[in-house]
């Protein structure tokens, strides 16, 4: 199916899946860009995805020690309100 970008995020590199019919199936996002149709960017912290992860965090939110790295959460339980004070 190839890859698709979401809004202003541009295209995706090779190796990512998902179709382009809906941004809910787009699995590749670029660092530093986000749009209203990037669902994984809608978390307690906001921010943007660099990999197809559950939730994204700003780097300033990632000092809670709950699995955040390189500006993004690596697991579903990472992005909780208490994590992003």
Curated annotation (Swiss-Prot):
Annotated GO CC locations: intermediate filament
Annotated segments matching region 10 X 2 AA repeats of CG: 4-69
Annotated keywords: Keratin, Repeat
Tree of life domain: Eukaryota
Residues that span the membrane, as ranges: none
Role description: In the hair cortex, hair keratin intermediate filaments are embedded in an interfilamentous matrix, consisting of hair keratin-associated proteins (KRTAP), which are essential for the formation of a rigid and resistant hair shaft through their extensive disulfide bond cross-linking with abundant cysteine residues of hair keratins. The matrix proteins include the high-sulfur and high-glycine-tyrosine keratins.
Additional information: Human have a similar number of genes as other primates despite the relative hairlessness of humans.
Protein family per UniProt: Belongs to the KRTAP type 28 family.
Designated name of the protein: Small cysteine and glycine repeat-containing protein 5
Organism, as annotated: Homo sapiens
The gene coding this protein: SCYGR5
